[in-house]
Amino acid sequence: SYLTLSASEGSNALTVRWDIALRDLDYVLQLDRDGDAKLTWGEVRQRADDITRYATRHLALASGGAPCPLQATAPLQLDRHSDGTYAALALSARCPQLAQAVTVTYSLLFDVDPSHRGLVQWVAPGGTDAQALVFGTDSAEQSLRLQPPSWAETLRQYIWEGVWHIW
């Protein structure tokens, strides 16, 4: 899945865009109701609430030890990526306060596919460059700093993730 998180200066809200492959959602939620091995917009739309519930049960955000509850901000949409069609969820998380970092706990599909990875882009308040992170079973909880990373930190992270990916 592809998860984009961003925060704005002066706000306690986080903006969340989460694209999840329909093939993965079909595997766990059995979206293909007629069994023809082809998902239609109607089949996906009928299960939009189930998709949102499933996704938000597998993503937790917190800041300063307090949870930041997720809620949908727009109806489910579809988006095409190079490897297929994705459900695109528009969410927001309102935190009681944004402390120095946001703790993200990601567990989507880990119970059925331990090799699943979540690719995350994080844009800190006042930042223009996104920080890239990868969530996996061994890195399911990560801390996102509210200060934008330096160019050196960003480069180090890309090199680390690249080496880990090749390994």
Map each language-model feature to its residues:
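N-terminal soluble domains immediately following signal/targeting peptides that reside
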Residues: 1-164
